[in-house]
Amino acid sequence: MLYPSIDKLLNVVDSKYMLVHIASIRSKQMHDTNHYQMNEKDYVNKKELGRALEEVDKGLIKVIKKDN
């Protein structure tokens, strides 16, 4: 099962499409730079995408909307 759950994540982010976009960008950053917001042992997930979702859930990643 996915941790954190999609229902919990949608309380933080407005839409599932925005969530996918944010998580994909952050997971690529983690993969390329090997820089994490938390200690390695504090993550539940082993892969970058799951870790990016954990960071979103914990509020470590902020979403700033641009006005068009």
Residue positions per predicted region:
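Polar low-complexity intrinsically disordered regions
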Residues: 1-68
